[in-house]
């Protein structure tokens, strides 16, 4: 996993400079907790995730194949919890702290005082 994270962050920086085409990673966060390491990533599209995951020249595909070989020998050796959500519209409310999560990646829209509902804010994006 560390090799993939480094590869994606290097590509993100190179794409921001205009040196490479973006693989589609918008942002990522990793945290270590009692269950192990949790990594959350935000991508430009589901198609970008699948393109990266299946590209033989990128770090993910060889690592995934190695994981499957190891899991056949010892299914309890590594646990992967993978969820993909395609989000067309979303809302996150922050009262006080700086935006984080999806709002940090996609930007935040200030909540109006009156007459603006969550539905209106999502449609306006």
Q: What kind of feature is each model-predicted range?
A:
Residues 2-38, 72-77, 82, 108-124:
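Short, glycine- and small/hydrophobic-rich beta-strand elements in well-ordered beta-sheets
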Residues 33, 46-79:
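An amphipathic, aromatic/His-enriched active-site/gating alpha helix that lines ligand/cofactor pockets
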Residues 37-38, 49-51, 91:
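Short catalytic/ligand-binding loop motif for oxyanion handling, primarily in non-cytosolic enzymes
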Residues 42-44:
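Tryptophan-centric aromatic hotspots in well-structured domains and transmembrane helices
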Residues 59-66, 84, 89-91, 96-125:
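Long, compositionally biased terminal regions
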